[in-house]
Amino acid sequence: MGLTEQKQKHMEQLSDKNGIISALAFDQRGALKRLMAKYQSEEPTVSQIEALKVLVAEELTPYASSMLLDPEYGLPATKVLDDNAGLLLAYEKTGYDTSSTKRLPDCLDIWSAKRIKEEGADAVKFLLYYDVDSSDEVNEEKEAYIERIGSECVAEDIPFFLEILSYDEKITDSSGIEYAKIKPRKVIEAMKVFSNPRFNIDVLKVEVPVNMDYVEGFAQGETAYNKATAAAYFREQDQATLLPYIFLSAGVPAQLFQETLVFAKEAGAKFNGVLCGRATWAGSVKEYVEKGEAGARQWLRTIGFQNIDELNKILQKTATSWKER
């Protein structure tokens, strides 16, 4: 991949010495509030959310190559990252308009690539919901939006990480078998679209191409794919782009995510790392709400550390350097 000298430096900061991106994602806002609301009756406060992000950053960034945070609640956490950890900042508003199936993208109102860079970030991350089968009108609007962000990142000479979440406008349950059957095409075709150089994207943050809960050998009940078919989808995904790409954990349990990475490697996927969020830190939320800072730190230093340490060991065996793409 052809990077400017400045982008190259940022990419080095975001990855480990082997060129693998082992990044910790904690840019959750709406999802985090919902998670906290399970354990407390009152609305989570801004200071609560900020403090939890600080705790996770302090305890886990010594073991991550970089951390993804949001500028709304994550700025205090950006000040306590480990010296060796890079920083990504999210540029999108959380969630989407549920009154429409379009899920149009929307930047944070008072942020820009310039401002994100001024906060010390090594990359701009933007999340896009994309249904490859949506109308040309809707997808053209989304594509133009991404072009603007890409141009901003070129102007600021900062890497652009695009996170693509595939969906189907007509299927409301993305976790069911109906969507599982069409997910591979949705994920792979979206990657092809945004691999076009016109978008100026440096790294794709993507879903694995199948729902592992419906893969033979992983499924508890009915299956949507046998192992050979699932493996073929991972290979097809790998061939869909020349860009570096990393997997998101999509909130699945740590063990399943780790097993998925091994499966991807065995299938022949040359992915370049992960941006792993809830699979690493989710359990700290309950401890934080019920036992405060001390409880959260204890969890992060034991189970949280174990999650990230096991993930790192698996990444060294399964991921390849982004420099090879």
Swiss-Prot record:
It is an enzyme of class 4 (lyase). It holds the Pfam family DeoC. It catalyses: D-tagatofuranose 1,6-bisphosphate = D-glyceraldehyde 3-phosphate + dihydroxyacetone phosphate. One of its GO terms (molecular function) is tagatose-bisphosphate aldolase activity. Disulfide bonds: none annotated. GO terms for biological process: 6-sulfoquinovose(1-) catabolic process; D-tagatose 6-phosphate catabolic process; lactose catabolic process via tagatose-6-phosphate. Coiled coil: none annotated. Belongs to the aldolase LacD family. This is Tagatose 1,6-diphosphate aldolase. It comes from Streptococcus agalactiae serotype V (strain ATCC BAA-611 / 2603 V/R). The gene is lacD.
